[in-house]
């Protein structure tokens, strides 16, 4: 049983735009989160899911640098309809199971995610 971690990435927040690109000790919040998520042994792959309205070059660079996948939702309502973006991303990558993560908090409990996956597999 495989699990993909999908990070739903947006930069158009009204309160704090581009917050996932803010840096902490030289790394963006998004890169810190990716680094932490890579420690989850139960995960098959990590996928950044963005809309085509985002800054594609920045996300392509981050995906390549951090060796994660990138899904770009094309010409649809997925910028505001996050569920559609998750659905289309999981279909594109033929995901068996997904773990949804929002990337604006780099300090998630990866051990809890690992335990949830193990519990689900039982």
PLM features per residue range, with description:
Residues 31-96:
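Conserved N-terminal catalytic core of the sugar/cofactor nucleotidyltransferase
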């Amino acid at each position: 049983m495989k699990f993909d971690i999908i990070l739903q990435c947006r930069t158009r927040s009204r309160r704090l735009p581009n917050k996932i690109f803010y840096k902490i000790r030289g790394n963006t919040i998004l890169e810190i989160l990716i680094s932490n998520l890579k420690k989850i042994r139960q995960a098959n792959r990590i996928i950044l899911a963005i809309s085509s309205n985002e800054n594609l070059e920045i996300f392509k660079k981050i995906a390549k640098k951090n060796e994660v996948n990138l899904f770009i939702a094309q010409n649809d309502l997925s910028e505001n309809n996050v569920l559609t973006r998750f659905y289309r991303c999981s279909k594109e990558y033929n995901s068996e199971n997904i773990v949804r993560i929002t990337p604006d908090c780099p300090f998630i409990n990866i051990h809890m995610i690992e335990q949830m996956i193990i519990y689900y597999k039982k």
